[in-house]
């Protein structure tokens, strides 16, 4: 069965606290034909993400005011199981052209972290990190590398957090096997965060097989090396040389 996925605008890097992961979960419940996430309770979000109900309520209030993410929210209060429940209908704003994809398995990933609140904090960090990765990759490359490695001061400014918080997040992410340091930057290892895009064509399927093999075997994946051509009718044609010379030695699974 094909995995379900969600598209997320890179504008989530401009929101604070745990709002990115809360928005991502709401978006994952959206009907793509109507752009509506219906019958989503704040209690459901709290239980699914492992964060307090009060934190979710504050996050939802902030998201309601951000028209780049949520157009409007219609609340319906009902009595269920002897108590009031508020079901929200979220009219989700249309993504601009700058977005990325995640598999919905991301929300169920325990990341080998026992504490749910810590998992959610890390997931929120990974989503925001993805927004500033090199286009169609899960690699963040420093503009001004420090000793051929990650420039943490630069990264903290791009994420809008202080370096102390960044260091804690990076340490947790490395220990949980969610990122690794590479030359001049770092690589997101979580395979629920799609490096490029979700498309059912042979080139993309082959690239994802190569990509997953690399992640599983400790190899830094090759970038998608598409040649992009915009046609007269405005359509986009991609041509992909799938196996760069440096990766032709890899033994990959057979495509069926």
Regions found by a protein language model. Give the residues of each.
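Short recognition helix of helix-turn-helix/winged-helix DNA-binding domains
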Residues: 1-44, 48, 61, 65-69, ...
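Short amphipathic alpha-helical interaction segments
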Residues: 52-62, 162-172
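Conserved small/polar residues in nucleotide/adenosyl-binding loops
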Residues: 245-254
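Short, amphipathic alpha-helical interaction segments positioned at domain boundaries
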Residues: 91-109, 196-223
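A short, conserved structural fragment
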Residues: 65-76, 174-184
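Short helix-coil junctions and helix-kink-helix linkers
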Residues: 43-52, 152-162
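Short linear proline/tyrosine/threonine-rich motifs used for host-factor recruitment
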Residues: 236-238
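Short, cationic-aromatic polyanion-contact patches
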Residues: 75-98, 184-206
């Amino acid at each position: 069965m094909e995995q379900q996925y969600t598209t997320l605008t890179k504008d989530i890097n401009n929101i604070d606290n745990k709002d990115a992961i809360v928005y991502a979960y709401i978006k994952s419940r959206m009907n793509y034909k109507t752009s509506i996430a219906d019958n989503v309770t704040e209690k459901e979000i709290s239980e699914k993400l492992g964060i307090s109900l009060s934190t979710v309520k504050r996050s939802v209030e902030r998201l309601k005011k951000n028209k780049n993410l949520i157009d409007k929210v219609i609340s319906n209060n009902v009595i269920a199981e002897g108590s009031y429940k508020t079901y929200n209908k979220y009219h989700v704003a249309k993504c601009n052209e700058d977005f990325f994809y995640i598999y919905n398995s991301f929300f169920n990933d325990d990341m080998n972290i026992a504490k749910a609140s810590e998992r959610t904090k890390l997931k929120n960090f990974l989503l925001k990190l993805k927004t500033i990765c090199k286009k169609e990759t899960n690699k963040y490359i420093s503009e001004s590398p420090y000793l051929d490695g990650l420039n943490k001061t630069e990264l903290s400014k791009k994420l809008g957090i202080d370096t102390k918080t960044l260091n804690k997040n990076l340490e947790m992410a490395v220990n949980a096997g969610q990122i690794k340091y590479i030359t001049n930057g770092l690589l997101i290892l979580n395979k629920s965060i799609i490096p490029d895009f979700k498309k059912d064509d042979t080139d993309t399927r082959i690239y994802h097989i190569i990509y997953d093999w690399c992640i599983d075997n400790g190899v830094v994946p090759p970038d998608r090396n598409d040649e992009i051509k915009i046609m007269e009718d405005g359509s986009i044609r991609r041509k992909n040389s799938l196996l760069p010379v440096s990766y032709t030695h890899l033994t990959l699974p057979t495509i069926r």
